[in-house]
Amino acid sequence: MTDYKNTLNLPDTGFPMRGDLAKREPGMLERWYEQDLYGIICQARKGKKTFILHDGPPYANGSIHIGHSVNKILKDIIIKSKGLMGYDSPYVPGWDCHGLPIELKVEQLIGKPGEKVSAAEFRTACRRYAAEQVEGQKKDFIRLGVLGDWEHPYLTMNFATEANIIRALGKIIANGHLHKGAKPVHWCIDCRSALAEAEVEYYDRTSPSIDVAFAADDVRAVAAKFGAADFAGQISLIIWTTTPWTLPANRAIAVHPDFDYQLVEVEGQGYILAADLVDSVMARAGITCWTVLGSAKGSALELLRFRHPFMGFDVPAILGQHVTLDAGTGAVHTAPGHGPDDYVIGQQYGLEVANPVGPDGCYLPGTLPALDGLQVFKANDVVINLLCDSGALLHVEKLQHSYPHCWRHKTSIIFRATPQWFVSMDQRGLRKQSLAEIKDVQWIPGWGQARIETMVANRPDWCISRQRTWGVPMALFVHNETEALHPRTIELMESVAQRVEQDGIQAWWDLDPAEILGDDAAHYHKVPDTLDVWFDSGSTHSSIVAVRPEFEGHAPDMYLEGSDQHRGWFMSSLMISTAMHGKAPYRQVLTHGFTVDGQGRKMSKSVGNVVSPQQVMDKLGADILRLWVASTDYTGEMAVSDEILKRSADAYRRIRNTARFLLANLNGFDPARHSVSPEQMVVLDRWAVGRAQAAQAEIVAAYDSYDFHNVVQRMMQFCSVEMGSFYLDIIKDRQYTTKADSIARRSCQTALYHIIEALVRWMAPIMSFTADEIWGFMPGERAQYVFTEEWYDGLFGLDAAQPLNDAYWQILLQVRSETNKVIEQARADKRIGGSLEARVTLYAEPDLAASLRELGDELYFTLLTSNAVVADYADAGDDAVQCEGLKGLKIALAKAEGEKCPRCWHYETDIGQHADHPEICGRCVTNVAGPGEERKFV
């Protein structure tokens, strides 16, 4: 028997079937960095319109986790897709390098500054530790396939950046937004430092809930307000609190001016309570019998005085709109040193901002003998005993409630008034301007706008000073007596910045004030505080983007971080940019959700559900991780597990197999010599290129709107359905059996070439390693890397005006689908083996029949049968199957006549009719020894 294998155009490519990504990707990375791929991209994009995605700096501490991977991959997808859109989109990764977590790590290694090591030695150790952490994280980020200027990242501890952070503060001071005050701020006892809003987390805590009686200083005056001048007993205003330890700092009691208050008598004692809360207070105090003596508005109680239960002084009743009837008594214990609302109202009444608590959370000496030196949370019971002894405790119980905790230590924090520096939200209109700027930013998803608007509207002044060692100094000089800033503050800060630019932040602590103050050094001293680390990262639009040459002075277009950054980096950046320049630092803000396991649970080592990006890359490869990120809707929680990653790996294989089929069938094709013009191409091939054109339009639009999961879905639909289930199946016969250099085959290869040119670009932002691998196997002259290209512009489609247009092929897809159902049933019934053993008759209504006859004797190629006949619908016999999915069509199937051709596998009746080739069919004889068959449609 003659072997006709050498007469077939069998697929052949060096592109492997298996990705082996975990093994192959590291070698590709090595090549990328040896050849300076990022530099090549920058050179290719030079002079194009810019798109700047500014990297929010991760903290330089610890290994990267799956959330870091999501963040960096999303950024990389955007950067690469913007490049394909024709943008110059430089990416400069950064790290946040100052702050408490690094201090704590270094303390564990070498001890606290001022003990075993000097502050200068401690800072040097912090800098060294942060640099080590950056290098470790950098390797993992690079392994993800993220392209950027990894050789020159920005670090907030770079000398020039530290100097620019000081300059940013100088600009804010020049614009009048800084002030100093002894305001209550979030204070962590363990950190011994103020905390930013973004460093506070809320957890449930059980606290003592107490009702306390403040006895009236002038009973007659108070009783008269309620029309009960004859009442002779003691009268007390009852407050409610869950922080008994703050009572030593009480300086007033706030009531609402518009609420009704009642004076009620209980066993000869008079209690003042909000009328709406009398029943609930009496119920929890176990009091069943009382008499209402009179009522008065809260406004009538203003400035009446009441005795502190154990501190030996009296305090006024004051009016406050913040008082509510949600819980308590309607009278609010007011300690201006321990609460923001208390502080604000205290300023209105000129109250003392008392702060009897030290930085360690213990009462200062001289507070009260029973409390001096006691830690505040341990003092609650002592305070309650003091209240019992004075007869002022009406009721006590345990209450579980949400309470602020330190994000680092997970321990309860306190409000504590200390002299701090603040960026004011209102003294120069920063809040109002920020709210206006928010409206000009595109927030993705849209709910982000309302979220940050609420935060800005309600946030207090920003405490930017910290009492830490490892941080950027505030670089301020204040008067020894008045604490006023030096009149040449801006000039002096620039002088300090220049020194820091040369020698780093240590230059500030080494600075002798006389060097720049001259004679004024006798009257001014250096402020020892450092800046909140959120000021470091929040000023990078100025300290980094505005000065890096690759950004060419352009402002950032996009910030992209996790949804927790509305109150973190997005907020601090907005505050600083608006305070400096009167405008937001970004045009778009995109947020992604947190990663959870397959059951929607937060990842936890104790639960054992943590997915390590390093392990995923070592097992499956970075492209699988990248494909998972892209295919997940990032606007909500992002679920990841072994099973979910397995599904991503399956999707990857389908896309890879499509690419491999295209490459294998482009064997021997040179686009410069073999391309067929659209007018000469087989109609089905033009249709396939048109489907790629339609897919590309949707994919590019999805990339542009950052809908990456829709990119993946459309790519999968194109590869699996439009190509894999239809076109690629149909063309195998023509591709393999026609003459190698025939129009029929070259038309098909031309289509495959256009499709792979488009597909590799669609893949590049997401499956970057695989796209680069494909690029290396594609025919024709091309640039070194796909990453320097733009979207493929060589696609074209069918003319909608011609009969065999897209709509026509959609009908044919339906006919093929219905035919496949009949064939599958026949195979199940053992009537045939494969579809080429079948001969089908399509009984169709007149319009459909006319459409099917357009393909002439090429119709059967679309159905993958050996023969297909179109007949009138009315002539269908009982053996014809009515199609459910396509009305007006019945299909009858019979076994194909003739013998199986060993070359094309079709069943034909003309085998043996050619003396030189007696074993093959007439069509194959034409392709082997004759002029070759012609194809017009299929």
Curated annotation (Swiss-Prot):
Subunit structure: Monomer.
Ligand binding (Zn(2+)): 901, 904, 921, 924
Keyword Lipid metabolism tagged: no
Cofactor stoichiometry and binding remark: Binds 1 zinc ion per subunit.
UniProt GO MF annotations: aminoacyl-tRNA deacylase activity; ATP binding; isoleucine-tRNA ligase activity; tRNA binding; zinc ion binding
NCBIfam families: ileS
PROSITE patterns, alphabetized: AA_TRNA_LIGASE_I (PS00178)
Motif ('KMSKS' region): 602-606
Function: Catalyzes the attachment of isoleucine to tRNA(Ile). As IleRS can inadvertently accommodate and process structurally similar amino acids such as valine, to avoid such errors it has two additional distinct tRNA(Ile)-dependent editing activities. One activity is designated as 'pretransfer' editing and involves the hydrolysis of activated Val-AMP. The other activity is designated 'posttransfer' editing and involves deacylation of mischarged Val-tRNA(Ile).
Swiss-Prot/TrEMBL cofactor(s): Zn(2+)
EC number: 6.1.1.5
InterPro entries: aa-tRNA-synth_I_CS, aa-tRNA-synth_Ia, Anticodon_Ile_BEm, Ile-tRNA-ligase, Ile-tRNA-ligase_type1, Ile-tRNA_ligase, M/V/L/I-tRNA-synth_anticd-bd, Rossmann-like_a/b/a_fold
Catalyzed reactions: tRNA(Ile) + L-isoleucine + ATP = L-isoleucyl-tRNA(Ile) + AMP + diphosphate
Gene3D superfamilies: 1.10.730.20, HUPs, Valyl/Leucyl/Isoleucyl-tRNA synthetase, editing domain
First-level EC class: ligase
Predominant cellular place of this UniProt entry's protein: cytoplasm
Protein name: Isoleucine--tRNA ligase
GO BP field: isoleucyl-tRNA aminoacylation
Motif 'HIGH' region: where in chain: 58-68
Gene Ontology CC annotations of this record: cytosol
Family designation: Belongs to the class-I aminoacyl-tRNA synthetase family. IleS type 1 subfamily.
